[in-house]
C-alpha cells in the first residue's frame, strides 16, 4: 500500500547486474575486471608519481591527485560487488549494505563535482592571472578547497541518506541494476517518493548545475584571455592546459545529468544501466589517460622516475 507499511518488510535486495546477458557473462566479466584493474593501476600510479616528483608539487597536480583518489574510490564503491555478482548464485545485498553503498558512491560523485569546479578556478587563476597565480592559489587555499569539496559531498549525500531511510520497501526487491542507485530504489519503494524525487532534483541542481556554471564562467574568462594572446604558440599552450579538464568535465557531467536529471521509471532502467557503466567504470579509467597522454610535465616526470630507478638498479 503506497505511503504505508505492508506485512512484508524488505531486508535485502537482489542486484540483477548483467545476468540478463548469460551468454556474455564471461566476456563482460573480463572486460569489467580489466577496466577495474587498469583504473586502479593508472590512478594510484598517477597519485604516487605526483607525490614523489617535486616538479609536480603545484596546485594543478594537487587537485589532479585528489581527482585520481576520488576516481579510485568511485569505481571501487561499485565494481567489486558487480564483479562478484557474475559468479554468485545469490546476488543479494542487505538493505543496510545497499544504502551504505549508495551513500559512499553519492558522496564521491558529489565531491568530484565540486573538485572539477575547483580545478576550473585553478586554471582560471593560472591563465588569467599568471603573475599572481602563486599568491592566489596558496597551499592553504588549495587544501581548504579540497576539504570543502569532500565535506560538501558528504553533506549532500548524508541528506539523501536520511531521506532514503524514511522509505518503506514492501514489494518486489529486485534491482535491475549492478549497484544500489537512487533512481532504482525510488522505483521499488512503496512509500510516497515525490519528496525524494524533488530532493534528488535539488541536489542535482546544486551540485551539477552550480558546478557547471562555475566552470563555464571560469572558461569564459579563460577563452577571453587566450584570444588576447598574440603568439600562436602561447595560445596553443594555454588551450592544451585546459583541453584535458574540459574533456573530463564534459564526460562526467554529460553522463551524470543524463541519469539524475530525469524522473525514475521502469522503462528507462536499461538506458540508466548503460549510462551508469560509462560514468562509474569508463570515466574513472579514462581520466588519468586524459590528463596524462598529452601532458609534457607528466611525461617528463615519468622519464625522471625511470632514470632514477634505472640508476639505482645499476649502483
From Swiss-Prot:
Q: Which residues lie on this side of the membrane: Cytoplasmic?
A: 51-54, 121-123, 166-202, 262-272
Coiled-coil features, chain-numbered ranges: none
PROSITE patterns attached here? G_PROTEIN_RECEP_F1_1 (PS00237), G_PROTEIN_RECEP_F1_2 (PS50262)
Question: Which pairs of positions does the record mark as disulfide bonds?
Answer: 98-180
Alphabetized, the UniProt keywords read: Cell membrane, Disulfide bond, G-protein coupled receptor, Membrane, Olfaction, Receptor, Sensory transduction, Transducer, Transmembrane, Transmembrane helix
Q: What happens when the gene is disrupted?
A: Mice show stongly reduced sensitivity to muscone.
**Record-annotated membrane-spanning stretches:** 30-50, 55-75, 100-120, 124-143, 145-165, 203-223, 241-261, 273-293
Q: How does it sit in the membrane?
A: Multi-pass membrane protein
> Would the keyword Transmembrane helix turn up in this protein's UniProt record?
yes
Instruction: Give the tissue specificity.
Output: Localized in the dorsomedial and ventral region of the olfactory bulb.
Q: Which GO terms describe its molecular function?
A: G protein-coupled receptor activity; olfactory receptor activity
Cite the ranges annotated as topological domain Extracellular. Answer: 1-29, 76-99, 144, 224-240, 294-315
Spell out the PANTHER family in the cross-references. Answer: OLFACTORY RECEPTOR
Q: What is this protein called?
A: Olfactory receptor 5AN6
Q: Which gene encodes it?
A: Or5an6
Amino acid at each position: 500500500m503506497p505511503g504505508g507499511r505492508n506485512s512484508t518488510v524488505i531486508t535485502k535486495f537482489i542486484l540483477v547486474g548483467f545476468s540478463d546477458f548469460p551468454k556474455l557473462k564471461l566476456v563482460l566479466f573480463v572486460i569489467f575486471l580489466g577496466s577495474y584493474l587498469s583504473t586502479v593501476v593508472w590512478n594510484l600510479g598517477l597519485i604516487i608519481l605526483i607525490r614523489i616528483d617535486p616538479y609536480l608539487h603545484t596546485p594543478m597536480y594537487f587537485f589532479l591527485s585528489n581527482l585520481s583518489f576520488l576516481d579510485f574510490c568511485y569505481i571501487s564503491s561499485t565494481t567489486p560487488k558487480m564483479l562478484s555478482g557474475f559468479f554468485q548464485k545469490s546476488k543479494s545485498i542487505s538493505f543496510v549494505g545497499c544504502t551504505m553503498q549508495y551513500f559512499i558512491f553519492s558522496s564521491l560523485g558529489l565531491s568530484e563535482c565540486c573538485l572539477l569546479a575547483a580545478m576550473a578556478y585553478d586554471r582560471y587563476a593560472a591563465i588569467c592571472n599568471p603573475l599572481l597565480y602563486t599568491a592566489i592559489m596558496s597551499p592553504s587555499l588549495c587544501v581548504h578547497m579540497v576539504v570543502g569539496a569532500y565535506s560538501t559531498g558528504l553533506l549532500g549525500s548524508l541528506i539523501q541518506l536520511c531521506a532514503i531511510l524514511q522509505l518503506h520497501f514492501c514489494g518486489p526487491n529486485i534491482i535491475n541494476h549492478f549497484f544500489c542507485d537512487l533512481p532504482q530504489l525510488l522505483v521499488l519503494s512503496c512509500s510516497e517518493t515525490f519528496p525524494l524525487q524533488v530532493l534528488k532534483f535539488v541536489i542535482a541542481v546544486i551540485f551539477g548545475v552550480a558546478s557547471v556554471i562555475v566552470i563555464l564562467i571560469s572558461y569564459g574568462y579563460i577563452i577571453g584571455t587566450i584570444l588576447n594572446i598574440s603568439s600562436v604558440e602561447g595560445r596553443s599552450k594555454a588551450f592544451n592546459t585546459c583541453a584535458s579538464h574540459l574533456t573530463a568535465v564534459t564526460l562526467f557531467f554529460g553522463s551524470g545529468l543524463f541519469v539524475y536529471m530525469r524522473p525514475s521509471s521502469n522503462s528507462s532502467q536499461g538506458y540508466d544501466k548503460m549510462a551508469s557503466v560509462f560514468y562509474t567504470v569508463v570515466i574513472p579509467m579514462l581520466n588519468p589517460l586524459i590528463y596524462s597522454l598529452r601532458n609534457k610535465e607528466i611525461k617528463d616526470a615519468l622519464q625522471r622516475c625511470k632514470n632514477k630507478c634505472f640508476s639505482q638498479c645499476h649502483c
